[in-house]
Structure formats: structure tokens, C-alpha cells
């Protein structure tokens, strides 16, 4: 017969009581009332906070956006096909955040920072809130360093500085993405981390951008965040914030970053869709009342940090699509008022063969010459004025039958200046090449050439200077000034090279 030893049992019970820790898990839970169109109505969740992450029993996550008296409106971060009415839901007590780190460079990810390029998982131990607060006034300093785009029209007349927000605006198929990708290509060897955010684009368009970056060796310093046209509206709305969180990580590590949002019109449309399904009151063009805040809190995160914070920078190039050149629509006017200038791409110029199709007359950079090196200021100061005078005279010349010689000369010069602004895609120019081209145009060296010969002559002149006069590029790169020696090299080289070129063209 088994004997029961009371003292042994009491010892075990005492030991268990000593090691017992009083741990109570309090969960804020709710029940699914209704689900559809990426929106879930939930009963319960009494203590949920606006913007809090919500977890459904089958693993899908969502964000609580509408806190109403009888239910909570949640937007889904996924398709939510397995969510059922009456299902259980719990609040996580966390706000949406994404992993960040150097491991993301060269990868293509979605709005939840999950890789979609088929190259395996990305290991990262650091996290950042998707919706981080922007740096305050004392955390910033004024912009003084140029961010070279490699596009002569922008770098000479609409300069962009590190930490600036410059809007790229224009109709569809006017080369907006091409301007942005060329800017990424030009950051090679400039120690700038690039983030390209594709919102609601065709998968083929994103694949084309990724292929271009890969072929040109630019993907190694670029992160691509992509949510395609078939993605959930919530993910299209979140994608720019995910891109900004990744760029901020590098900015606070004292690095320079460039972020491109392609494009914010589609993000606004996704947000409008979410808001209307949540039954928020519609405003102008059926957008919700806080659509301005949607873009302002995103673009204010771009900054040039103060010396105390390491002088890192985040430059934003948001893209906005217009309908038939209407820049007075709701989203274009909102983003124009938030940014530090805009580059306007014109369908008429694009169709006339001027690529990039930048309308210099109405494009502006509010940072201006503070974002230019001294050499560019010295050479390009006359360029915008001469082009403006030419545009005015060209409009007048359509009605005038006979023009005096001075006006004819001005027209001829203007046509040649406009010709030197033409550039093929994925072929950014160095600062020295831009200065050489502008100097040749402004000082009349191109006046005796036919319009069709200008591009070829400038390419040959650039090749000649690189091989035979490398000192010119050295001066520009080292002193950042257009010195007398640099000018003497151009004065000596351009006429002799032009004579040789014209002779070859005649043969």
C-alpha cells in the first residue's frame, strides 16, 4: 500500500507558492461586425487608440482609423479574405513600425518592409515608426549643399539642395519618372542613399525602373518600396511612410538620402477610397478634409539636420500627375504649397521633342542659388534670363513678318540654348560637362552651328576635354569655382574644336 507523506506534499506546495508570480494578461478585444472592401467594423476594443495596430485571429493586421461611439473602423493591411463576421480581434498596443537597416540596400520591398524580389529574407534588428514626427526647427539648418541631378536644365536653373522638397509635376507620359531615375543614377560615387517609392504603378513599370537601376549599377545604393496598382488601398497609403522611415534611418546616421515618391496623386486616391469606405465626410473632389495633412506630415520629414545631429539630410522629390496640365486642381495645389519649389513638365514640349520636357518659365526652386556651387552660379546666371527673353520674342515672332537683325540673332541664340538643354535618358552629365555646355552657348560659340549639330559637337567637345585637357575637370571638382584658368582652357579649346568639327561635317 502506498503511503502518503504529508510533509513532502506540503513542502512541494510551499515551494510552488514561493515561485508563483502573479501575472495577469489584460487583452483589449473585440468582435468583427462587418467586413468588406478592405474595411472592418469591430464591436468592442473600448480602449483602442487612433492609429493602433489591430490583430485578427487568423493573423491579418489592420490599423484603427475611425473611433466611433458604437464601433471601430479598421483598415486592413492585406486582403483579409479569411476574416469572418463574429471573429475575435485584439488590440496590440503598438503603432505600425517597420524594420530598418543597411541590409535593405539593393532590395525591392513592399509597404510592410517584406522583400518581394525573391532574394530571401532581410535580417534587421532595428525598427522605426512608419509615421515618425518630423525634425523640429532647432533640429534643422538652412540648405547649402547641392544635390546634383545630372540634368543640365535643373542643375543650372532650378537647383536642388540636400534637404529640399522639390515637386516634379506634369501630365502622364511627360517623363516625370525619367527625371527621378536619372537623379538616382547621378548619385553614383556621391555617397547618397536613394529610396524609390512606387505607389499604384503597373508592375511592368516598376520592373523597368529596377532593371535600369541594376544595369547602371545604381541598385546597390537604392531601396525600392513598391505597392502595385492591384495592392490594397491601405498598403498604397502606407508605402510612402515606409520609404520615409527607411530614409530617416540613414539621415539620423549622418548620411545623405534622396527619396522619390512616384506618385502622391495615387496615394491621395487610395486615402480617398479608404476614407469614403469608412464613411468620413467628403470634401473638395471627394477627398477627405485631412488630405493636406496626409502629404504635409510626409514631406515635412525631409530635412537638412543641424550640426548637433550630424548634418545628415533627406531630400524629397515627390511626383504629382496633372490632368491636361491643370496645376490648380486640389492635390497639385496642396503639394505645391508644401514643397520648396516645383519642376513642371509640359506635354507640348515633350511632343515637340524637347526632352526632358521642363518648362523653365514656370518651374522654380525656392532654395535657389544657395544650392549651387560657385562655378555654376558664375556661368548659369544669364541662362534663365536669355531663355525667358527668347520665349517672349519667339511668341512675338509668330505674328511679325520681318524682324531686325538683332532680334533674329537673339532668336538664333535662344534656339541653340534650348537645344543644349536636351538630354537623352539615363545619361546624366557631370558638373564640368554642364558648365562647358552652358559657357559655349552663352558666349555665342554655338551660333554658327546648325541646330542638329549641337548635341554631337558638345559630346565630341566633352570627350576631347576629358582626354586632352583633364585639368578643366580637376579645377571644377577641386575648387568648385570657374577660375580664370578654367575659362582660358575653354576659350582656347572651343574655337579650334569647332573649326575641326565643321571641317569634318563638310567632308
UniProtKB/Swiss-Prot annotation:
EC number annotated for this UniProt entry: 7.1.2.2
Compartments (UniProt record): Plastid membrane
Catalytic activity, as annotated: ATP + H2O + 4 H(+)(in) = ADP + phosphate + 5 H(+)(out)
Keyword Nucleus: no
Keyword terms: ATP synthesis, ATP-binding, CF(1), Hydrogen ion transport, Ion transport, Membrane, Nucleotide-binding, Plastid, Translocase, Transport
Superkingdom to which the source organism belongs: Eukaryota
Short name of one Pfam family: ATP-synt_ab_N
GO CC annotation terms, alphabetical: plastid membrane; proton-transporting ATP synthase complex
InterPro entries in the cross-refs: ATP_synth_asu-like_sf, ATP_synth_asu_C, ATP_synth_asu_C_sf, ATP_synth_F1_a_nt-bd_dom, ATP_synth_F1_asu, ATPase_a/bsu_AS, ATPase_F1/V1/A1_a/bsu_N, ATPase_F1/V1/A1_a/bsu_N_sf
Residues the UniProt record annotates as site (Required for activity): 363
Keyword ATP-binding in annotation: yes
Family: Belongs to the ATPase alpha/beta chains family.
Protein name per UniProt: ATP synthase subunit alpha, plastid
Species the sequence originates in: Cuscuta gronovii
Amino acid at each position: 500500500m502506498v503511503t502518503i507523506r504529508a510533509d513532502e506534499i506540503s513542502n512541494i506546495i510551499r515551494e510552488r507558492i514561493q515561485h508563483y508570480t502573479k501575472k495577469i494578461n489584460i487583452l483589449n478585444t473585440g468582435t468583427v461586425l462587418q467586413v468588406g472592401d478592405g474595411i472592418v467594423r469591430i464591436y468592442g476594443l473600448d480602449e483602442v487608440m487612433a492609429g493602433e495596430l489591430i490583430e485578427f485571429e487568423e493573423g491579418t493586421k489592420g490599423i484603427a482609423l475611425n473611433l466611433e461611439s458604437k464601433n471601430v473602423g479598421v483598415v486592413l493591411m492585406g486582403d483579409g479574405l479569411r476574416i469572418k463576421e463574429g471573429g475575435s480581434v485584439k488590440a496590440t498596443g503598438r503603432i505600425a513600425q517597420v524594420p530598418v537597416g543597411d541590409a535593405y540596400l539593393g532590395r525591392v520591398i513592399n509597404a510592410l518592409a517584406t522583400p518581394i524580389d525573391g532574394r530571401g529574407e532581410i535580417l534587421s534588428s532595428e525598427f522605426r515608426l512608419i509615421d515618425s514626427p518630423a525634425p523640429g526647427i532647432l533640429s534643422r539648418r538652412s540648405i547649402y549643399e547641392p544635390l546634383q541631378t545630372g540634368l543640365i536644365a535643373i542643375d543650372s536653373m532650378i537647383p536642388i539642395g540636400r534637404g529640399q522638397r522639390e515637386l516634379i509635376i506634369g501630365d502622364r507620359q511627360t517623363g516625370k519618372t525619367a527625371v527621378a531615375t536619372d537623379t538616382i543614377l547621378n548619385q553614383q560615387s556621391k555617397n547618397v542613399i536613394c529610396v524609390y517609392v512606387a505607389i499604384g504603378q503597373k508592375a511592368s513599370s516598376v520592373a523597368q525602373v529596377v532593371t535600369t537601376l541594376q544595369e547602371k549599377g545604381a541598385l546597390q545604393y537604392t531601396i525600392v518600396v513598391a505597392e502595385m496598382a492591384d495592392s490594397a488601398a491601405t498598403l498604397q497609403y502606407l508605402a510612402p511612410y515606409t520609404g520615409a522611415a527607411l530614409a530617416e534611418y540613414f539621415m539620423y546616421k549622418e548620411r545623405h538620402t534622396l527619396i522619390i515618391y512616384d506618385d502622391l496623386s495615387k496615394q491621395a486616391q487610395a486615402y480617398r477610397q479608404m476614407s469614403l469606405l469608412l464613411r468620413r465626410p467628403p470634401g473638395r473632389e471627394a477627398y477627405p478634409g485631412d488630405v493636406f495633412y496626409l502629404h504635409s506630415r510626409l514631406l515635412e520629414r525631409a530635412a537638412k539636420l543641424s550640426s548637433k545631429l550630424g548634418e545628415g539630410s533627406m531630400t524629397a522629390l515627390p511626383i504629382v500627375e496633372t490632368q491636361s496640365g491643370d496645376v490648380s486642381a486640389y492635390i497639385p495645389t496642396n503639394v505645391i504649397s508644401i514643397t520648396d519649389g516645383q519642376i513642371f513638365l509640359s506635354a507640348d514640349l515633350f511632343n515637340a521633342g524637347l526632352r526632358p520636357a521642363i518648362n523653365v518659365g514656370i518651374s522654380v526652386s525656392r532654395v535657389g542659388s544657395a544650392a549651387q556651387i560657385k562655378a555654376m552660379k558664375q556661368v548659369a546666371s544669364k541662362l534663365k534670363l536669355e531663355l525667358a527673353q527668347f520665349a517672349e520674342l519667339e511668341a512675338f515672332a509668330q505674328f511679325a513678318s520681318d524682324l531686325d537683325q538683332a532680334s533674329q540673332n537673339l532668336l538664333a541664340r535662344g534656339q541653340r540654348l534650348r537645344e543644349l538643354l536636351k538630354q537623352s535618358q539615363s545619361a546624366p552629365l557631370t558638373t564640368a560637362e554642364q558648365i562647358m555646355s552652358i559657357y559655349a552657348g552663352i558666349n555665342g560659340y554655338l551660333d554658327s552651328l546648325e541646330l542638329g549639330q549641337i548635341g554631337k559637337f558638345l559630346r565630341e567637345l566633352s570627350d576631347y576635354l576629358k582626354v586632352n585637357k583633364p585639368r578643366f575637370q580637376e579645377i571644377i571638382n577641386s575648387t568648385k569655382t570657374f577660375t580664370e584658368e578654367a575659362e582660358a582652357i575653354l576659350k582656347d579649346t572651343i574655337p579650334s574644336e569647332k573649326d575641326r568639327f565643321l571641317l569634318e561635317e563638310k567632308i
